[in-house]
Amino acid sequence: MPQLRRVEQPGGNRGRVGQRWQKPPGTPQGYAGLANAQPVTPLAAIEAQDVARTPSGLSELDRVLGGGVVEGGVVLIGGDPGIGKSTLLLQAMDALQRSGLPTLYVTGEESGAQVALRSRRLGIEGSQVNLLAEIQLEKILATIDAVQPAVAVIDSIQTVYSDQLSSAPGSVAQVRECAAHLTRMAKSTGITVILVGHVTKEGALAGPRVLEHMVDTVLYFEGDTHSPHRLIRAIKNRFGAVNEIGVFAMTEKGLKGVSNPSAIFLSQHSEPVPGSCVMVTLEGTRPLLVEIQALVDSGGPSPRRLSVGLDKDRLAMLLAVLHRHAGVACMD
Protein backbone atom coordinates (compact mmCIF):
# COMPACT_ATOMS: atom_id res chain seq x y z
CA MET A 1 0.00 0.00 0.00
CA PRO A 2 1.61 3.35 -0.99
CA GLN A 3 2.18 5.82 1.84
CA LEU A 4 1.46 9.54 1.68
CA ARG A 5 3.85 11.95 3.33
CA ARG A 6 3.04 15.42 4.56
CA VAL A 7 4.99 18.35 3.12
CA GLU A 8 5.01 21.72 4.85
CA GLN A 9 4.89 24.92 2.84
CA PRO A 10 7.79 27.36 3.20
CA GLY A 11 7.35 29.99 5.84
CA GLY A 12 7.25 27.86 8.93
CA ASN A 13 3.52 27.09 8.94
CA ARG A 14 3.32 23.90 10.93
CA GLY A 15 -0.44 23.84 11.58
CA ARG A 16 -3.16 22.57 9.32
CA VAL A 17 -3.12 25.74 7.21
CA GLY A 18 -0.45 25.61 4.54
CA GLN A 19 0.07 21.87 4.72
CA ARG A 20 -0.69 19.60 1.80
CA TRP A 21 -0.40 15.94 0.93
CA GLN A 22 2.13 15.07 -1.72
CA LYS A 23 2.27 11.84 -3.67
CA PRO A 24 5.66 10.19 -3.14
CA PRO A 25 7.64 9.30 -6.26
CA GLY A 26 7.09 5.85 -7.67
CA THR A 27 3.43 5.62 -6.61
CA PRO A 28 1.41 3.27 -8.89
CA GLN A 29 -1.00 5.08 -11.21
CA GLY A 30 -3.89 2.61 -10.84
CA TYR A 31 -5.31 4.06 -7.63
CA ALA A 32 -8.47 6.10 -8.11
CA GLY A 33 -7.77 8.09 -4.94
CA LEU A 34 -4.53 9.42 -6.49
CA ALA A 35 -6.04 10.37 -9.86
CA ASN A 36 -5.45 13.80 -11.32
CA ALA A 37 -7.92 16.53 -10.45
CA GLN A 38 -10.69 17.24 -12.96
CA PRO A 39 -11.86 20.70 -14.03
CA VAL A 40 -14.78 22.14 -12.09
CA THR A 41 -17.60 24.42 -13.24
CA PRO A 42 -19.43 27.06 -11.18
CA LEU A 43 -23.04 26.12 -10.60
CA ALA A 44 -24.28 29.39 -12.13
CA ALA A 45 -22.45 28.63 -15.38
CA ILE A 46 -24.22 25.31 -15.94
CA GLU A 47 -27.15 25.53 -18.34
CA ALA A 48 -30.22 23.89 -16.80
CA GLN A 49 -33.15 22.79 -18.94
CA ASP A 50 -36.52 21.35 -18.12
CA VAL A 51 -36.54 17.57 -18.04
CA ALA A 52 -38.25 16.10 -21.10
CA ARG A 53 -40.75 13.35 -20.32
CA THR A 54 -42.19 10.60 -22.45
CA PRO A 55 -45.68 9.35 -21.51
CA SER A 56 -45.71 5.64 -20.71
CA GLY A 57 -49.19 5.11 -22.14
CA LEU A 58 -50.65 4.42 -18.67
CA SER A 59 -52.09 7.65 -17.28
CA GLU A 60 -52.06 6.52 -13.64
CA LEU A 61 -48.38 5.54 -13.88
CA ASP A 62 -47.55 8.84 -15.56
CA ARG A 63 -49.31 10.71 -12.74
CA VAL A 64 -46.97 9.15 -10.17
CA LEU A 65 -43.85 9.58 -12.32
CA GLY A 66 -44.62 13.27 -12.80
CA GLY A 67 -45.74 13.09 -16.42
CA GLY A 68 -43.80 10.18 -17.88
CA VAL A 69 -40.39 8.52 -18.01
CA VAL A 70 -37.26 10.67 -18.12
CA GLU A 71 -34.37 10.12 -20.51
CA GLY A 72 -31.50 8.51 -18.60
CA GLY A 73 -33.61 8.06 -15.47
CA VAL A 74 -33.48 4.97 -13.29
CA VAL A 75 -36.73 3.80 -11.67
CA LEU A 76 -37.01 1.14 -8.97
CA ILE A 77 -40.43 -0.43 -8.44
CA GLY A 78 -41.15 -2.87 -5.62
CA GLY A 79 -44.18 -4.80 -4.45
CA ASP A 80 -45.40 -8.07 -3.01
CA PRO A 81 -45.16 -11.23 -5.14
CA GLY A 82 -48.10 -11.57 -7.51
CA ILE A 83 -49.29 -7.99 -7.02
CA GLY A 84 -48.89 -7.18 -10.75
CA LYS A 85 -45.49 -5.51 -11.19
CA SER A 86 -44.55 -7.50 -14.29
CA THR A 87 -48.02 -7.05 -15.76
CA LEU A 88 -47.86 -3.28 -15.25
CA LEU A 89 -44.44 -2.95 -16.88
CA LEU A 90 -45.26 -5.28 -19.77
CA GLN A 91 -48.31 -3.16 -20.59
CA ALA A 92 -46.24 0.03 -20.32
CA MET A 93 -43.49 -1.37 -22.58
CA ASP A 94 -46.05 -2.39 -25.19
CA ALA A 95 -47.63 1.08 -25.13
CA LEU A 96 -44.20 2.73 -25.54
CA GLN A 97 -43.31 0.37 -28.38
CA ARG A 98 -46.55 1.14 -30.20
CA SER A 99 -45.81 4.86 -29.86
CA GLY A 100 -42.60 4.35 -31.82
CA LEU A 101 -39.99 3.92 -29.06
CA PRO A 102 -37.77 0.81 -29.05
CA THR A 103 -38.03 -1.11 -25.79
CA LEU A 104 -36.30 -4.07 -24.15
CA TYR A 105 -37.79 -6.32 -21.48
CA VAL A 106 -35.17 -8.42 -19.65
CA THR A 107 -36.68 -11.22 -17.60
CA GLY A 108 -34.73 -13.27 -15.12
CA GLU A 109 -37.67 -14.96 -13.42
CA GLU A 110 -39.64 -16.26 -16.41
CA SER A 111 -38.84 -17.84 -19.74
CA GLY A 112 -39.62 -16.11 -23.00
CA ALA A 113 -42.53 -18.48 -23.62
CA GLN A 114 -44.07 -17.62 -20.24
CA VAL A 115 -43.89 -13.88 -20.94
CA ALA A 116 -45.39 -14.39 -24.41
CA LEU A 117 -48.22 -16.45 -22.92
CA ARG A 118 -48.95 -13.72 -20.37
CA SER A 119 -48.96 -11.04 -23.06
CA ARG A 120 -51.57 -12.97 -25.04
CA ARG A 121 -53.66 -13.44 -21.92
CA LEU A 122 -53.56 -9.67 -21.45
CA GLY A 123 -54.76 -9.12 -25.00
CA ILE A 124 -51.43 -7.74 -26.22
CA GLU A 125 -51.43 -9.17 -29.72
CA GLY A 126 -48.55 -8.67 -32.12
CA SER A 127 -46.39 -6.89 -29.57
CA GLN A 128 -42.98 -5.81 -30.88
CA VAL A 129 -41.37 -5.45 -27.44
CA ASN A 130 -37.88 -6.95 -27.55
CA LEU A 131 -37.54 -9.73 -24.99
CA LEU A 132 -34.38 -11.15 -23.42
CA ALA A 133 -34.33 -14.00 -20.90
CA GLU A 134 -30.96 -13.51 -19.22
CA ILE A 135 -29.50 -12.96 -15.74
CA GLN A 136 -25.81 -12.31 -16.47
CA LEU A 137 -25.05 -8.60 -16.24
CA GLU A 138 -22.35 -8.54 -18.91
CA LYS A 139 -24.65 -10.16 -21.50
CA ILE A 140 -27.49 -7.79 -20.57
CA LEU A 141 -25.25 -4.74 -21.03
CA ALA A 142 -23.98 -6.08 -24.37
CA THR A 143 -27.56 -6.61 -25.57
CA ILE A 144 -28.60 -3.13 -24.49
CA ASP A 145 -25.61 -1.70 -26.37
CA ALA A 146 -26.60 -3.65 -29.50
CA VAL A 147 -30.36 -2.99 -29.40
CA GLN A 148 -30.16 0.63 -28.14
CA PRO A 149 -33.66 0.74 -26.62
CA ALA A 150 -35.20 3.94 -25.32
CA VAL A 151 -36.51 2.12 -22.23
CA ALA A 152 -35.21 -1.12 -20.69
CA VAL A 153 -36.86 -3.14 -17.91
CA ILE A 154 -34.83 -5.47 -15.67
CA ASP A 155 -37.15 -7.98 -13.98
CA SER A 156 -35.74 -8.36 -11.42
CA ILE A 157 -32.52 -6.83 -10.08
CA GLN A 158 -32.27 -9.59 -7.45
CA THR A 159 -31.83 -12.24 -10.16
CA VAL A 160 -29.00 -10.47 -12.01
CA TYR A 161 -25.39 -11.39 -11.28
CA SER A 162 -21.97 -10.29 -12.50
CA ASP A 163 -19.10 -12.64 -13.34
CA GLN A 164 -16.77 -10.18 -11.64
CA LEU A 165 -18.13 -11.22 -8.23
CA SER A 166 -18.12 -14.65 -6.67
CA SER A 167 -21.21 -14.16 -4.49
CA ALA A 168 -24.61 -15.59 -5.38
CA PRO A 169 -27.32 -13.64 -7.26
CA GLY A 170 -29.44 -11.61 -4.87
CA SER A 171 -26.63 -11.03 -2.38
CA VAL A 172 -25.92 -7.53 -1.13
CA ALA A 173 -22.74 -7.22 -3.18
CA GLN A 174 -24.34 -8.49 -6.40
CA VAL A 175 -27.41 -6.25 -6.12
CA ARG A 176 -25.29 -3.19 -5.32
CA GLU A 177 -22.75 -3.69 -8.10
CA CYS A 178 -25.26 -4.73 -10.79
CA ALA A 179 -27.48 -1.74 -10.00
CA ALA A 180 -24.45 0.57 -10.07
CA HIS A 181 -23.39 -0.68 -13.52
CA LEU A 182 -26.92 -0.32 -14.90
CA THR A 183 -27.22 3.18 -13.42
CA ARG A 184 -23.93 4.31 -14.97
CA MET A 185 -25.03 2.88 -18.30
CA ALA A 186 -28.34 4.77 -18.12
CA LYS A 187 -26.65 8.09 -17.30
CA SER A 188 -24.03 7.74 -20.04
CA THR A 189 -26.38 6.63 -22.83
CA GLY A 190 -29.68 8.34 -21.96
CA ILE A 191 -31.54 5.02 -21.82
CA THR A 192 -34.31 4.86 -19.22
CA VAL A 193 -33.88 1.83 -16.96
CA ILE A 194 -36.68 0.38 -14.82
CA LEU A 195 -35.61 -2.08 -12.13
CA VAL A 196 -38.05 -4.46 -10.47
CA GLY A 197 -37.20 -5.16 -6.83
CA HIS A 198 -38.29 -7.79 -4.34
CA VAL A 199 -39.68 -6.87 -0.92
CA THR A 200 -39.16 -8.42 2.50
CA LYS A 201 -41.82 -9.85 4.80
CA GLU A 202 -42.07 -6.42 6.44
CA GLY A 203 -42.82 -4.78 3.08
CA ALA A 204 -39.45 -3.01 2.65
CA LEU A 205 -37.40 -3.34 -0.51
CA ALA A 206 -34.98 -6.26 -0.31
CA GLY A 207 -31.27 -5.69 -0.74
CA PRO A 208 -28.91 -2.93 0.38
CA ARG A 209 -30.32 0.45 1.35
CA VAL A 210 -27.90 2.07 -1.07
CA LEU A 211 -30.07 0.71 -3.89
CA GLU A 212 -32.79 3.24 -3.08
CA HIS A 213 -30.23 6.06 -2.81
CA MET A 214 -28.71 5.13 -6.16
CA VAL A 215 -31.83 5.36 -8.33
CA ASP A 216 -33.82 8.46 -9.30
CA THR A 217 -37.31 7.19 -8.48
CA VAL A 218 -38.62 4.60 -6.04
CA LEU A 219 -42.17 3.32 -6.53
CA TYR A 220 -44.23 0.96 -4.41
CA PHE A 221 -46.97 -1.11 -6.02
CA GLU A 222 -49.33 -2.31 -3.32
CA GLY A 223 -52.77 -3.73 -2.74
CA ASP A 224 -54.77 -6.51 -1.18
CA THR A 225 -54.62 -9.82 -3.03
CA HIS A 226 -58.31 -10.31 -2.17
CA SER A 227 -59.20 -7.01 -3.87
CA PRO A 228 -58.82 -6.16 -7.56
CA HIS A 229 -57.60 -2.64 -6.83
CA ARG A 230 -53.93 -1.65 -6.74
CA LEU A 231 -52.19 1.53 -5.62
CA ILE A 232 -48.87 2.83 -6.89
CA ARG A 233 -47.09 5.58 -5.00
CA ALA A 234 -43.68 7.24 -5.11
CA ILE A 235 -41.53 7.50 -2.00
CA LYS A 236 -38.68 9.14 -3.90
CA ASN A 237 -38.73 11.08 -7.16
CA ARG A 238 -35.95 13.39 -8.29
CA PHE A 239 -38.06 14.55 -11.23
CA GLY A 240 -41.46 15.04 -9.61
CA ALA A 241 -43.63 15.04 -6.50
CA VAL A 242 -43.70 12.15 -4.06
CA ASN A 243 -47.23 12.58 -2.76
CA GLU A 244 -49.12 11.41 -5.86
CA ILE A 245 -50.85 8.04 -6.08
CA GLY A 246 -52.13 6.06 -9.02
CA VAL A 247 -55.06 3.65 -8.82
CA PHE A 248 -55.46 0.56 -10.99
CA ALA A 249 -58.00 -2.23 -11.20
CA MET A 250 -56.80 -5.73 -12.03
CA THR A 251 -59.00 -7.30 -14.69
CA GLU A 252 -58.74 -10.41 -16.84
CA LYS A 253 -57.21 -8.18 -19.52
CA GLY A 254 -54.59 -6.69 -17.24
CA LEU A 255 -54.43 -3.47 -15.24
CA LYS A 256 -56.82 -0.66 -16.05
CA GLY A 257 -56.46 2.86 -14.68
CA VAL A 258 -59.22 4.09 -12.36
CA SER A 259 -60.02 7.67 -13.32
CA ASN A 260 -62.51 8.16 -10.45
CA PRO A 261 -61.08 6.32 -7.43
CA SER A 262 -63.60 7.94 -5.07
CA ALA A 263 -66.25 5.60 -6.45
CA ILE A 264 -64.42 2.53 -5.15
CA PHE A 265 -63.99 3.98 -1.65
CA LEU A 266 -67.71 4.70 -1.13
CA SER A 267 -70.46 2.20 -0.46
CA GLN A 268 -73.64 2.74 -2.42
CA HIS A 269 -76.40 3.50 0.10
CA SER A 270 -79.77 4.74 -1.10
CA GLU A 271 -80.24 6.65 2.17
CA PRO A 272 -78.05 7.80 5.09
CA VAL A 273 -76.78 5.02 7.34
CA PRO A 274 -75.99 5.55 11.04
CA GLY A 275 -72.30 5.27 11.88
CA SER A 276 -71.10 6.19 8.39
CA CYS A 277 -69.70 9.48 7.12
CA VAL A 278 -67.87 10.68 4.02
CA MET A 279 -64.78 12.88 4.16
CA VAL A 280 -62.44 14.42 1.60
CA THR A 281 -58.71 13.75 1.67
CA LEU A 282 -56.07 15.14 -0.66
CA GLU A 283 -53.50 12.78 -2.17
CA GLY A 284 -51.11 14.98 -4.12
CA THR A 285 -53.25 17.00 -6.51
CA ARG A 286 -56.11 14.50 -6.43
CA PRO A 287 -59.00 14.95 -3.96
CA LEU A 288 -60.48 11.63 -2.83
CA LEU A 289 -63.79 10.91 -1.15
CA VAL A 290 -63.47 8.17 1.46
CA GLU A 291 -66.08 6.66 3.72
CA ILE A 292 -65.50 6.10 7.43
CA GLN A 293 -67.70 3.56 9.15
CA ALA A 294 -67.98 3.17 12.92
CA LEU A 295 -69.48 0.25 14.82
CA VAL A 296 -70.22 1.06 18.47
CA ASP A 297 -71.55 -1.60 20.79
CA SER A 298 -72.53 -1.43 24.45
CA GLY A 299 -69.27 -1.72 26.32
CA GLY A 300 -68.47 -3.25 29.66
CA PRO A 301 -66.50 -1.64 32.43
CA SER A 302 -63.34 -1.57 30.24
CA PRO A 303 -64.35 -1.05 26.59
CA ARG A 304 -61.77 -1.46 23.83
CA ARG A 305 -61.47 0.68 20.75
CA LEU A 306 -60.33 -1.20 17.66
CA SER A 307 -59.57 0.16 14.19
CA VAL A 308 -58.73 -1.31 10.81
CA GLY A 309 -56.34 0.66 8.63
CA LEU A 310 -55.66 3.33 11.29
CA ASP A 311 -53.11 3.24 14.09
CA LYS A 312 -54.87 2.68 17.41
CA ASP A 313 -52.77 5.31 19.20
CA ARG A 314 -53.66 7.89 16.56
CA LEU A 315 -57.32 6.90 16.89
CA ALA A 316 -57.17 7.42 20.67
CA MET A 317 -55.61 10.86 20.18
CA LEU A 318 -58.25 11.93 17.64
CA LEU A 319 -61.08 10.78 19.91
CA ALA A 320 -59.55 12.69 22.83
CA VAL A 321 -59.35 15.88 20.73
CA LEU A 322 -62.96 15.47 19.62
CA HIS A 323 -64.08 14.97 23.20
CA ARG A 324 -62.11 17.91 24.58
CA HIS A 325 -62.58 20.57 21.90
CA ALA A 326 -65.70 19.51 19.97
CA GLY A 327 -67.74 18.08 22.80
CA VAL A 328 -68.19 14.79 20.95
CA ALA A 329 -68.25 11.91 23.42
CA CYS A 330 -67.41 8.70 21.56
CA MET A 331 -68.54 6.40 24.32
CA ASP A 332 -71.70 4.85 25.76
Predicted regions, residues:
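N-terminal juxtadomain amphipathic helix
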Residues: 1-43
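The Walker A/P-loop phosphate-binding site
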Residues: 25-122, 141, 145
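Short hinge/gating elements
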Residues: 45-48, 79, 102, 162-169, ...
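Flexible beta-alpha connector loops of hexameric P-loop NTPases
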Residues: 50-52, 78, 104-107, 125-134, ...
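Structural recognition of the conserved hydrophobic beta-strand(s) that form the central parallel beta-sheet
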Residues: 105-107, 130-132, 153-154, 191-198, ...
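Phosphate-binding/switch loop-helix module in NTP-utilizing enzymes
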Residues: 131-190
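Phosphate-binding/switch region of NTP-binding enzymes
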Residues: 180-270
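Conserved P-loop NTPase/AAA+ ATPase motor core
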Residues: 245-246, 252-332
